[in-house]
Amino acid sequence: MKNNRILALSGNDIFSGGGLAADLATYTLNGLHGFVAMTCLTALTENGFEVFPTDETIFQQQLDSLKSVDFGGIKIGLLPTVGVAEKALNFIKERTGVPVVLDPVLVCKETHDVAVSELCQELIRFFPYVTVITPNLPEAELLAGQKIETLDDMKDAAQKLHDLGAPAVIIKGGNRLSQDKAVDVFYDGENFTIFENPVIQGQNAGAGCTFASSIASQLVKGEELLPAIESSKAFVYRAIAQADQYGVRQYEANQN
């Protein structure tokens, strides 16, 4: 490993189960030097769990501060607005050859308002510039523009997202297709790989962030994509098994 510096473009989860806390914990456990450009803050208010986007000028200043840093990999998480996303996209366009993992987090993903639609279109613009995308089932439905109710639907959506420009796709199905097992579908443009694990009951906040940052970490360390996904699946499974009320536990997962 020639370069152990890895960047997260992600938000701050106030409870530290996900977001930049999960990213940095995962980077540290992999022996990497983690950097963060913060995309948003979060807080639990009388209105529920709220997201407060980073001012676009400040976000750009963060990225400008990192221009001279040579990164071995980048993980992209919550991009709360089109404006923030555009600045992130311009940043990775200048990093050709660097592995990039895009976790296309869609806030309020159960709604289909104009803001979500615009953000979907902006995230699709990232696809040709990343290594792999890691949507969950609702995010894959929004990005692919289709309902997913069966394993074949997951495969169709993965192919559609690949056709939109993503070199590789892993759709995290969770337990929506089956009550007793979690099903994920990986597609690299040629072959499908199906992952199945028993469902763990409990808090899984931060699992998606941890999964994406673990994949990015393995790629920085020189692993090929499919083995990176396989080892990251195992790591996240252990992290969910050790979760508390605030989310998955990366450090405890690494001890098992």
Residues covered by each model-derived region:
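Acidic-glycine-rich active-site phosphate/pyrophosphate-binding loop
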Residues: M1-K2, A8, G19, Q179-I194
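Conserved N-terminal subdomain of the carbohydrate kinase-like
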Residues: K2-A8, L20-K109
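Short pre-catalytic strand/loop immediately N-terminal to key active-site residues, enriched for Gly-Thr
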Residues: S10-F15, F192-A205
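Short glycine/serine/threonine-rich phosphate/pyrophosphate-binding segments
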Residues: F15-L24, C209-A212
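Phosphate-handling active-site elements
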Residues: G31-F35, F192-T193, Q218-S231
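Charged C-terminal helix
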Residues: P53, L226-N256
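Conserved phosphate/ATP/ADP-binding segment of small-molecule kinases
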Residues: V116-N191
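Short, small-residue alpha-helix embedded
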Residues: E141-L142, Q201-L225
